[in-house]
Amino acid sequence: NYIYSGHNYHQ
């Protein structure tokens, strides 16, 4: 799943 942190996406 993807998590949006501030201005970056993490898989």
Swiss-Prot record:
EC number(s) per entry: 4.2.2.-
Superkingdom of origin organism: Bacteria
Keyword Lyase found: yes
Keywords, comma-separated and alphabetical: Heparin-binding, Lyase
Thermal dependence summary for this entry: Optimum temperature 45 degrees Celsius.
Enzyme superclass (EC): lyase
An example Gene Ontology molecular-function term: heparin binding
Record function comment: Degrades acharan sulfate and, to a lesser extent, heparin and heparan sulfate.
Protein's recorded name: Acharan sulfate lyase 1
